[in-house]
């Protein structure tokens, strides 16, 4: 017994000694844990790198940096002091809304000094930049490595054969480089390997499958983007190879087009739990063999655009399936049938991604999935009422039904108590948001935009975790009070735009939230400026346009948050000092103060601003201050003010300018030459000023689409560079100037030209015969698009874009008007009020897409356009006050869209062709043509109307003939009924028997309904905008 006591005492003392030595070694005095030899090796390694972001600032040989075990990214064995871990990986940083992400990478080359670290078992150098060099062979000598990650680090070349020496490796990640795989025999030596990624490598080895299956312990394999569609394993390889341990398989982006190219997956093992095949080119039916993978939990088939037939019935065998993603696969299937085929996973399924497909039907039966957490169904063709499908779903956290055709009232949302995000935008829901919304205590994002909802409940104010609320573009009405907003302490994005709401709060109300996005256009916030904005310190977007504010800017309003990006106060009646408002911050991207009562001199253009709108105000004086601008906006609109004086000649500094609108001011003098240096310019409006002199050259502005210089006093001839250099021009308006000379035929090279207005000048000579080269005018469709500028980036957490739509002053159907976005619907040529001579070229008749042609008030002779009947889209034709002669062509009657016609004051003769269309015009359309006759003018002398044709056939009794014509025989009716039943049941029978025909038929019906709905929405939206502008 005493022996055991002494033995235990000795063991205790020994352990205590070890602990004392370890503590002393690690913490005592000035003694360092780091070994000198390994410190020197690490410093040599550092010298081979370029550290632009100070990742290795803690590394050094200074006295206070001697302990290398405390350097960033270094770990040591606490007992021996040997370096065991080097972790210098970087992470991508993606700023909100950025199209690309950034990583603060190390650059340079790897030093073989790492070989001195003989106990190194963990090396992570991922997401760095090693100059597209080959992976150093010496890494294959770090034999104790268990973890090696060189992914996304700009390596290239072949994988060193020396990797076969890394027999202790459990994780090897070489993905996202530019490696070439010619030999994989080294893999068979890595008997402990559990994770392997060779993603984005260029496979040039035919026996890759055979070699990979020689790694018996492999659990996860990533071969994404390796071009495996061209390297299908042979049947012999499939028969003799397997990977029983494999659980997770990544095969994204391999250009697989059919299941035969990845059928080897089903030979590997039946134990797979996760497969991703997203971003391939799969087509046809989904392989039934997925249903044999009884352990499958995760299946991703997203972004394969040609999958047909939907979910196969074999998926009912996947009783462990937790995650299924078939988004953006163009799947056409009846949704209730799809849910039925997933019934085997009704207890396990947690995430179901079906967005961006062609699913139809209602979402009934969605409640059968008792574990469902996330359901993505946006951008389909779902219809029916939400109420039909509502049932208690206590687990659902994310539901997206946006951009469908669902209708009716919303259900009691308290049925979804776990919801964190609810997206119902762009449907046809009606009624009020249910009172039960207030019970969703975990709700963070609520989007009900673009529906027909009418009211907001006060229970909204109970959503203390709500971060984003978007109810824009509904028909909400009534008053929002403090009760609606009382507890929304987490709210950062509020969008109630384009409703009929009034926001009424007490004068000293302090909101419980700090918003990043405030979007309240068309909400009634006035007449006074909303004082609660003074409490908001973090917003990046402030849009209170159309808000019925008629007040002077308060002094506190100029103290903006430093990150403000969008400021929109347009369409109010606000007055005050603009200079204080926009000169106190450098973060602006968009400033829109248009349609207000601001006055005074032009303020300096703020630094970094991209869109700057001051139009429809009362600014006055010179704009020479623009030369002091330190920024180059993308879009600048100063139109409809009282600016005067000469235009400054400093535009060469605004190199980014794409839209410049200086119309409707009092500018005088010549157009400065520096405007011609704006190589990014797409639209230039300077109409209705008093500019004089000749046109400067815009030949460098080769992207110019709109050139509107009408209503000035410009002189000289039309320059040839318009036709040779401005080949993208779509609108050319030089109307109401003092130009002379002939119309140069070189402008016929403008194949994209849609609107040509040279009216009211002094142009002479003949009309060129090449107008049929205007390709867009030759096409009989509307191909116009608005000019659109998107401000890059997210503001708050959510994307925003800003749209610029230009206008044009044109003579359309005998009325001079301004048209917003004329490129969408106008195709016109106006050469009126000049001194043109000669005949009208017959080539004009080839312009079948032309909608308005005005050649009036010239000295043209000859006949009305030969072949004019081809111009079937023509709505307005004015050839009055010329010297045209001859008869009116008969095919003029073919122009069924023609609503304005004026051929008066010519020398036309003969009878006006007979048609309901031509006789419906007023007499003034044909007046002052001395020899023209026929309705609606006086009848032609001696004209006798043609007699009705009478059938003198065998039946000599007209009454009997009429009866025979009027009453078909009984046999006719019987055959008609039989034909209807045969056709009806024949088509219906095919739809019942053939599911693919049935799906295609219903998809056609749904597509047609969607198209009609979309068209009606577009026209309704345009009508709303016109009505708002009219107000």
From Swiss-Prot:
TM region(s), chain numbering: 972-992
Record's subunit section: Interacts with EIX elicitor protein.
Protein name as annotated: Receptor-like protein EIX1
Residue stretches of each LRR repeat: 117-140, 142-165, 166-189, 191-215, 216-240, 243-266, 269-292, 293-317, 318-341, 346-369, 370-393, 394-416, 417-440, 441-463, 465-487, 488-509, 512-536, 538-559, 561-584, 586-611, 612-629, 630-654, 655-678, 679-703, 705-725, 726-750, 752-773, 823-847, 848-871, 872-895, 896-918
Annotated gene: EIX1
Domain of life: Eukaryota
GO terms classed as biological process: defense response to fungus
Annotated stretches, region: C-cap/acidic domain: 919-971
All ranges on the Extracellular side of the membrane: 30-971
Subcellular location: Cell membrane
Annotated glycan sites: 30, 149, 165, 240, 267, 317, 365, 383, 487, 538, 568, 597, 653, 666, 773, 781, 854, 861, 894
Keyword annotations from UniProtKB, A to Z: Cell membrane, Glycoprotein, Leucine-rich repeat, Membrane, Plant defense, Receptor, Repeat, Signal, Transmembrane, Transmembrane helix
SMART domains listed in its UniProt record: LRR_BAC, LRR_SD22, LRR_TYP
Signal peptide: 1-29
Cytoplasmic side: 993-1031
Record has S-adenosyl-L-methionine as a keyword: no
Entry similarity comment: Belongs to the RLP family.
GO CC, alphabetical: plasma membrane
Membrane topology label: Single-pass type I membrane protein
One of the Pfam families matching this protein, by short name: LRR_1
Keyword set includes Glycoprotein: yes
Region of interest (N-cap), residue spans: 30-113
């Amino acid at each position: 017994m005493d022996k055991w006591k002494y033995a235990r005492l000795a063991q205790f003392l020994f352990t205590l000694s070890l602990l004392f030595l370890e503590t002393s070694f690690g913490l005592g005095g000035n003694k360092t844990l780091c070994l000198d030899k390994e410190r020197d090796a690490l410093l040599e390694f550092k010298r081979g790198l370029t550290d632009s972001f100070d990742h290795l600032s803690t590394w050094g040989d200074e006295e206070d940096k001697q302990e290398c075990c405390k350097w960033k990214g270094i770990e040591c064995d606490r007992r021996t002091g040997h370096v065991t871990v080097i972790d210098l990986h970087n992470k991508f940083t993606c700023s909100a809304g950025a199209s690309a992400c950034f990583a603060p990478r190390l650059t340079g080359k790897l030093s073989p000094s790492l070989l001195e670290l003989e106990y190194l078992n963990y090396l992570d150098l991922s997401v760095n930049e090693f100059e597209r060099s080959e992976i150093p062979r010496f890494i294959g000598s770090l034999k104790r490595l268990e973890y090696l990650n060189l992914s996304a680090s700009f390596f290239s070349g072949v994988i060193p054969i020396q990797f076969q020496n890394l027999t202790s490796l459990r994780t090897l990640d070489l993905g996202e480089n530019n490696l070439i795989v010619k030999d994989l025999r080294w893999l068979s030596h890595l008997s402990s390997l559990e994770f392997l990624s060779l993603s984005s490598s260029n496979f040039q080895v035919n026996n890759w499958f055979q070699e990979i299956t020689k790694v018996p312990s492999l659990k996860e394999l990533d071969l994404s983007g390796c071009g495996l569609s061209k390297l299908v394993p042979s049947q012999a390889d499939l028969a003799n190879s397997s990977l029983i341990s494999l659980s997770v398989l990544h095969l994204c982006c391999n250009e697989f087009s059919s299941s035969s190219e990845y059928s080897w997956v089903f030979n590997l093992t039946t134990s797979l739990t996760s497969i991703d095949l997203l971003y391939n080119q799969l087509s046809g039916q989904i392989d039934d063999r997925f249903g044999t993978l009884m352990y499958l939990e995760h299946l991703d088939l997203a972004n394969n655009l040609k999958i047909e037939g939907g979910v196969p019935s074999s998926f009912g065998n996947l009783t462990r399936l937790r995650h299924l993603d078939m988004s953006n696969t163009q799947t056409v299937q009846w949704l209730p049938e799809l849910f039925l085929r997933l019934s085997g996973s009704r207890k396990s399924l947690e995430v179901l991604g079906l967005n961006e497909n062609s699913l139809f039907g209602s979402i009934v039966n969605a409640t059968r999935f008792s574990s469902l957490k996330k359901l993505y169904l946006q951008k389909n063709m779902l219809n029916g009422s939400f109420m039909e499908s509502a049932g208690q779903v206590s687990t659902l956290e994310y539901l997206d039904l946006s951009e469908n055709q669902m209708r009716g009232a919303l259900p009691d949302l308290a049925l979804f108590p776990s919801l964190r995000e609810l997206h119902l935008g762009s449907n046809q829901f009606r009624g009020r948001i249910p009172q039960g919304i207030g019970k969703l205590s975990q709700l963070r994002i609520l989007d009900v935009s673009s529906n027909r909802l009418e009211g907001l409940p006060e229970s909204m104010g109970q959503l203390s975790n709500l971060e984003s609320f978007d109810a824009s573009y509904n028909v909400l009405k009534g008053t929002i009070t403090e009760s609606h907003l009382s507890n929304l302490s987490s709210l950062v994005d509020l969008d109630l735009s384009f409703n009929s709401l009034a926001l009424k709060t007490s004068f000293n109300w302090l909101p419980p939230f700090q918003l990043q996005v405030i979007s309240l256009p068309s909400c009634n916030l006035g007449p006074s400026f909303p004082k609660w904005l003074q409490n908001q310190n973090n917003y990046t977007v402030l849009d209170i346009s159309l808000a019925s504010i008629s007040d002077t800017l308060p002094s506190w309003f100029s103290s903006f948050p430093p990150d403000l990006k969008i400021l929109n106060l347009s369409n109010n009646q606000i007055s005050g000092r603009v200079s204080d408002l926009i000169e106190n911050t450098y973060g602006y991207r968009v400033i829109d103060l248009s349609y207000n009562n601001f006055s005074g001199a032009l303020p300096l253009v703020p630094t970094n601003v991209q869109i700057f709108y001051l139009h429809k105000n009362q600014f006055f004086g010179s704009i020479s201050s623009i030369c002091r601008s330190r920024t180059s906006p993308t879009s600048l609109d100063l139109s409809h003010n009282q600016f005067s004086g000469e235009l400054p000649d400093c535009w060469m500094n605004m190199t980014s300018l794409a839209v410049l609108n200086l119309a409707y001011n009092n500018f005088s003098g010549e157009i400065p030459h520096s405007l011609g240096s704006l190589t990014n310019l797409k639209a230039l409006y300077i109409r209705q000023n008093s500019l004089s002199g000749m046109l400067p050259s815009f030949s460098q502005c080769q992207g110019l689409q709109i050139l509107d210089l009408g209503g000035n006093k410009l002189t000289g001839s039309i320059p040839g560079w318009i036709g040779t250099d401005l080949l993208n021009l779509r609108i050319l308006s030089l109307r109401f100037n003092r130009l002379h000379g002939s119309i140069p035929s070189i402008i016929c090279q403008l194949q994209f030209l849609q609107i040509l207005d040279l009216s009211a000048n002094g142009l002479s000579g003949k009309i060129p015969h090449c107008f049929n080269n205007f390709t867009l005018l030759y096409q009989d469709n509307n191909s116009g698009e608005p000019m659109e500028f998107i401000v890059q980036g997210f503001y708050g957490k959510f994307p925003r874009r800003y749209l610029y739509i230009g206008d044009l002053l044109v003579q359309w159907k005998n009325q001079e008007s301004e048209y917003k976005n004329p490129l969408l619907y106008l195709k016109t040529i106006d050469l009126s009020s000049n001194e043109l001579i000669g005949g009208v070229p017959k080539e004009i008749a080839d312009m079948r897409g032309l909608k308005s042609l005005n050649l009036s008030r010239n000295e043209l002779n000859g006949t009305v356009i030969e072949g004019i009947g081809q111009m079937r889209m023509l709505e307005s034709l004015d050839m009055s006050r010329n010297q045209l002669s001859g008869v009116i062509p008969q095919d003029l009657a073919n122009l069924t869209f023609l609503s304005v016609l004026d051929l008066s004051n010519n020398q036309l003769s003969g009878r006006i062709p007979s048609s309901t269309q031509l006789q419906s015009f007023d007499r003034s359309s044909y007046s002052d043509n001395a020899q023209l006759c026929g309705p609606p003018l006086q009848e032609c002398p001696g004209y006798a109307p043609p007699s009705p044709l009478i059938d003198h056939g065998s039946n000599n009794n007209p009454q009997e003939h009429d009866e025979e014509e009027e009453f078909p025989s009984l046999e006719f009716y019987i055959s008609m009924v039989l034909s209807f039943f045969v056709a009806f049941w024949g088509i219906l029978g095919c739809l019942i028997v053939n599911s693919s025909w049935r799906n295609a038929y219903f998809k056609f019906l749904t597509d047609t309904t969607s198209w009609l709905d979309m068209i009606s929405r577009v026209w309704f939206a345009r009508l709303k905008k016109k009505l708002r502008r009219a107000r």
